[in-house]
Regions:
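A conserved ligand/cofactor-binding region detector
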Residues: 1-273
Length: 273
């Protein structure tokens, strides 16, 4: 797995970044033989599952599941943390939250988000089925917590996977709604991601029919177009999708939740009190 951090230094007023190789071949993150296919822009990559043991309560052990690509190549990094952001198979997990000052960087963020969402959703469904779930009862076996909007595609992606298992769209939406909850951490724009439809269509064309249907469904619940999943400019509001299609929305503290209810997300609160 590749380094996800950088060391920042300054010399003569110039900031420089160097990779911090904190994650090495001797890491506690153990590779497994489990891989999940993930379609990125019509091209399939294989996300390998890594497991990291985490000390738990009363001597018990929890497991943190991580994913990476075998094709990642750190040698493409030059001049600190510069690399070709379009060479997805080599750079996808090199750096978390890469520079998004250009279109390539913004697309890379969506690629990163979908890799983790798709692989994670496939793992959740597989583990729940192994424990006896028939997927119709997924909410009895799993709880998916959406922290901010970075993993918001964990709503349409499980719907897609459930449809592949023969479950009708309307039921798949209800299953995902019952399984997912959303926590809003801040009202700042960077935590309320909005992606152009054209960007998502490049990265996850397989999700676009589902997102379109979710927007249609949300519009049947309210005449307030400000609450739509897709706005009049063709931008997809990830937080709106989260609120419409999860069973619970909260802030990180009681005061924050009250602010969301009374001001920032008041329209949604009136729709879903």
């Amino acid at each position: 797995m590749a380094s996800a951090c950088a060391i920042t230094t300054a010399s003569q007023g110039v900031q420089r970044e160097e990779p911090d190789p904190w994650l090495t071949d001797h890491s506690w993150a153990e590779p497994t033989d489990t891989v999940f296919p993930v379609s990125l822009g019509g091209h399939t990559v294989n996300a390998r599952l890594y497991r990291l043991a985490v000390t738990g309560y009363e001597g018990r052990t929890n497991t943190l599941n991580l994913f990476d690509l075998d094709t990642i190549d750190e040698s493409i990094v030059t001049e600190g943390i510069r690399f070709d952001k379009t060479d997805i198979e080599k750079c996808l997990t090199l750096f978390l939250y890469p520079d998004d000052s250009d279109e390539a960087g913004r697309l890379l963020r969506i690629y990163q988000q979908y890799l983790m969402v798709s692989a994670g959703a496939q793992l959740i469904l597989a583990e729940c089925q192994a424990r006896g779930s028939n997927l119709h009862d997924l909410a009895d076996y799993a709880a998916i917590q959406i922290n901010d909007t970075h993993p918001s595609m964990v709503i349409p992606e499980p719907i897609r996977l459930l449809e592949e298992q023969g479950i009708a769209f309307d039921e798949a939406v209800q299953i995902v709604t019952d399984t997912c909850a959303y926590t809003n951490h801040t009202i700042l724009a960077e935590a309320l991601e909005t992606w152009p439809w054209s960007y998502l269509e490049k990265v996850v064309p397989q999700l676009m029919p589902i997102i379109g249907k979710l927007d249609d469904l949300a519009r049947t619940r309210t005449d307030d177009t400000r609450l739509a999943v897709v706005d009049e400019h063709g931008n997809v509001h990830m937080a709106h999708m989260d609120i419409h299609f999860t069973h619970s929305t909260n802030g990180v503290a009681a005061l924050h939740t009250e602010i969301l209810k009374n001001t920032e997300l008041n329209g949604f609160y009136r729709l879903y009190p």
